[in-house]
């Protein structure tokens, strides 16, 4: 299931992405520093994996980190002695089961470096450059806005999933669920992907909030807690919708069982009605010579009347028992 109008950015895989450097001030101000060791301000950098391999030492983070963006499978953060390193694997909101937006990052108290060959991180930061102004500029607030930018449209997307599931449930109740159950399976799979994504973001925000390396000011740790709360809310909403899909599947199965029960009831009634008639037919089909009633002129209509009476009696009995 796709919600194209809520896809964050155009996909530019394979395009050459320029390296970008920003100073965290009242706004994110693009800069071209040569020495990151003696900066008097915190910074944000977005570079390619090739640039990281060639010049990672200029960021003075004290790490030897070989990252292969093609091997990224999840979102997580690792605590090192002099830095934090991690990866992002973000499902596309246009098609959650399709290719993901994968990039890596490394940060210390001086700033953060995103390693991104696709350009997703750069485009998100470009939106922040155009829309954000900071009263108290700091790395923590930038990280809050960056993480919030990843999820800020997700509430609307989840509302659309909810509305679609409501429609599928209505179709099931109206006995018009052709094609809907297959779509329900797709939605369930997409919700599972989102739920896993949110769980990983929750772990990442908690790790940042713990501030094991004391890179962040204690007063600013609240930004990561705010991110955690927002992502937790989304995680709970997707879990609730996943349960809703299970409810709809059970409801659809119940509808199928009801149809089958009705068919079996009809077959049982037909069998029960015709069983005594079959017995009578078989009785008189034995062709014994000495069957005195066969010589009576009223025998034939009497047998017909008896058969009709038996059939009516059976139908009345089933009706009284509410089997019909």
Please give the residue ranges for each predicted region.
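Helix-boundary and N-terminal cytosolic regulatory elements
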Residues: 2-133, 200, 204-216, 321-322
């Amino acid at each position: 299931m796709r919600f194209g109008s809520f896809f964050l950015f155009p996909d530019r895989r394979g395009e050459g992405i320029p390296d970008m450097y920003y100073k965290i001030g009242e706004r994110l101000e693009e800069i071209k520093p040569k020495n990151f060791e003696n900066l008097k301000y915190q910074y944000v950098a977005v570079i390619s994996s090739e640039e990281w391999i060639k010049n990672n030492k200029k960021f003075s983070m004290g790490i030897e980190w070989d990252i292969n963006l093609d091997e990224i499978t999840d979102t997580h953060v690792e605590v090192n002695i002099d830095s934090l390193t991690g990866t992002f694997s973000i499902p596309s909101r246009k098609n959650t089961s399709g290719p993901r937006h994968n990039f890596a990052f490394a940060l210390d108290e001086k700033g953060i470096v995103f390693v991104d060959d696709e350009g997703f991180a750069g485009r998100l930061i470009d939106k922040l450059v155009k829309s954000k102004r900071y009263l108290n500029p700091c790395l923590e607030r930038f990280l809050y806005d960056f993480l919030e930018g990843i999820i800020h449209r997700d509430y609307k997307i989840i509302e659309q999933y909810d509305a679609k599931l409501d429609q599928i449930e209505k179709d099931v109740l109206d006995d018009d669920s052709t094609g809907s159950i297959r779509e329900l399976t797709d939605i369930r799979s997409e919700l599972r992907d989102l739920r896993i994504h949110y769980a990983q973001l929750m772990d990442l925000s908690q790790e940042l909030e713990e501030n094991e390396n004391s890179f962040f000011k204690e007063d600013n740790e609240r930004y990561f807690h705010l991110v955690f709360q927002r992502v937790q809310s989304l995680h709970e909403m997707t879990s609730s919708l996943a349960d809703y899909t299970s409810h709809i599947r059970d409801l659809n199965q119940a509808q199928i069982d009801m149809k089958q029960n009705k068919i079996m009831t009809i077959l049982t009634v037909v069998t029960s009605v015709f069983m005594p008639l079959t017995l009578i037919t078989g009785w008189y089909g034995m062709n014994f010579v000495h069957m005195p009633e066969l010589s009576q002129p009223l025998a034939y209509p009497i047998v017909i009347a008896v058969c009709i009476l038996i059939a009516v009696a059976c139908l009345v009995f089933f009706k009284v028992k509410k089997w019909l």
